[in-house]
Amino acid sequence: MSSKSQLTYTARASKHPNALAKRLFEIAEAKKTNVTVSADVTTTKELLDLADRLGPYIAVIKTHIDILSDFSDETIEGLKALAQKHNFLIFEDRKFIDIGNTVQKQYHRGTLRISEWAHIINCSILPGEGIVEALAQTASAPDFSYGPERGLLILAEMTSKGSLATGQYTTSSVDYARKYKNFVMGFVSTRSLGEVQSEVSSPSDEEDFVVFTTGVNISSKGDKLGQQYQTPASAIGRGADFIIAGRGIYAAPDPVQAAQQYQKEGWEAYLARVGGN
């Protein structure tokens, strides 16, 4: 898979074939941040408070909306308003993993109403190609009013110890991304997938998938449940375009100060990668 990670966000935005990825790169450049904060809190008040306080320093807020104890219209409208106020995208880390008919309903129907407010979603390809096809089909349907403002990340790798998301699974992730590139904007992975060789698909000249890397933490190397952390510099150096940090920010004594530190380190690592100062 070809990689354009040595190019600036501005250069990538100017030629990117995916409208949401283009917007994401423009946000990153405008705010000088590649930080995604994983806001793993359990009440709407906590979520909206974090989104408002950290909004100026992040490109994306990542939610696990089903862990909220009080999800309601207030959650949805509040999050959408803050995304507009602070110019960030919303990534619902739902990790869809079921047959196509089911995930279509989970995404565009149901109590969580994910398609209404989440710019970005993700899925595992363990069920096969059908899950990506189904989500892409939903997003391109005539009655889907959000169109190019929605995109999918394929969970190609994970940072947990002993992860089975390796080898052929990762290669197939690349294959499906290429086939459904109008909706698939990139991957959640531990590195650039530029060296992945496929016998099924080949890169096009304009191919430019966005890489999000989870498990970024400045002060910790892991936890007791098998999570393995990278620093902002190591993640960006391995090909991440956007770094995802959770407890290192929201559980810090001063989350705003922590977000600013991740923003600084992530941006410096990006400038070093593209040859800036």
UniProtKB/Swiss-Prot annotation:
Entry annotation: catalytic residues: 95 (proton donor)
InterPro entries per record: Aldolase_TIM, OMPdecase, OMPdecase_AS, OMPdeCOase_dom, RibuloseP-bd_barrel
This enzyme's EC code(s): 4.1.1.23
EC class name: lyase
Protein name as it appears in the record: Orotidine 5'-phosphate decarboxylase
CDD domains attached to this UniProt entry: OMP_decarboxylase_like
Protein's organism: Aspergillus niger
Record keywords: Decarboxylase, Lyase, Pyrimidine biosynthesis
Pathway it works in: Pyrimidine metabolism; UMP biosynthesis via de novo pathway; UMP from orotate: step 2/2
Record-stated family: Belongs to the OMP decarboxylase family.
One of the Pfam families matching this protein, by short name: OMPdecase
GO MF annotation, one: orotidine-5'-phosphate decarboxylase activity
Catalysed reaction equations from the record: orotidine 5'-phosphate + H(+) = UMP + CO2
Keyword Translocase recorded: no
Keyword Heme: no
Any one annotated GO CC term: cytosol
Residues the record lists as binding substrate: 40, 62-64, 93-102, 229, 247
One of the GO biological process terms: 'de novo' UMP biosynthetic process
